[in-house]
A protein has these predicted regions:
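A flexible loop/linker signature enriched in serine peptidases of the S9 family
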Residues: 1-11, 27-43, 56-92, 104-121, ...
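Non-catalytic accessory segments flanking enzyme active sites
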Residues: 1, 13-19, 23-28, 175-231
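Generic structural signal for coil-to-beta-strand starts
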Residues: 22, 43, 101, 151-152, ...
């Protein structure tokens, strides 16, 4: 009775194949009726194509959600004040690291709060632990992609009304890759070149495709416009 992608806005970004093609990570909100209508608690599930087993990567085995009083706001209820990290908000858009050792996704902290901050969560298959690598970034993550060596993640984040590109390693050290009065989007790695492809627009220019060449740590990336479709 459940769907993936999630309605009404979800797309193919809400599921991902593992590099070895043996597993599928997918986004799903496994609730029905009133719970489905009120809750924003979607999780990332891992389906093993060989065994047929499904594992919830967001919650511990046997987890049972606290009872909810639907006549009151969820903000003050137990579901949002549990011991430990129960991932009760939106968890969406999984991406496996190229080496298959991690899977990352966007995660909101609170249930019932659709405007919560999107954090970037990285799950390690080695120890089953989650690490929110953008906790030090005081804003939301829009989209992201892994580097080919699986050591870093590039993401687009909003700061001072601009969408720029940032980089984080797996320990949560965040660095700015671009610093422009513009909005980047649709971020992807360009093969094994180490470069990125992204869209970019500003108050003076519509969307075009840009090549973004990251530099050594501590230096900003060099962006080169590739298309002029809207000139």
């Amino acid at each position: 009775p459940y769907e993936c992608p999630g309605e009404p806005f979800g797309g193919t970004e809400q599921l991902a194949w593992s590099p070895d093609s043996k597993k599928v990570a997918y986004t799903c909100r496994k609730k029905v009726g009133r719970e489905y209508a009120v809750s924003t608690d979607s999780d990332i599930y891992l389906y093993d194509t060989e065994s047929g087993n499904t594992t919830n990567l967001c919650k511990p085995d046997g987890y049972k959600a606290p009872a909810i009083d639907y006549t009151k706001t969820l903000a003050t209820q137990q579901v949002n004040h549990q011991d430990g990290d129960m991932s009760v908000g939106y968890d969406i858009n999984p991406q496996f690291s190229p080496d298959g050792k991690h899977v990352a996704w966007l995660s909101m902290k609170q249930d019932g709060y659709e405007s919560d901050r999107n954090r970037l969560c990285v799950y390690s298959f080695a120890d089953g632990k989650k690490n929110y690598v953008t906790d030090s970034f005081d804003s939301a993550v829009e989209t992201f992609c892994w580097t080919r060596d699986s050591h870093n993640i590039y993401f687009i984040g909003v700061w001072h009304a601009c969408l720029n590109i940032y980089r984080t390693d797996l320990t949560g050290k965040v660095e700015k890759a671009t610093d422009e009065i513009a909005d980047y989007g649709s971020l992807q790695m360009l093969g094994n070149t180490g470069n990125l492809i992204a869209t970019r627009h500003s108050m003076s220019a519509p969307d075009d495709i840009y090549l973004v060449a990251p530099q050594k740590k501590g230096k900003l990336a060099v962006s080169t416009r590739l298309t002029k479709e809207n000139d």
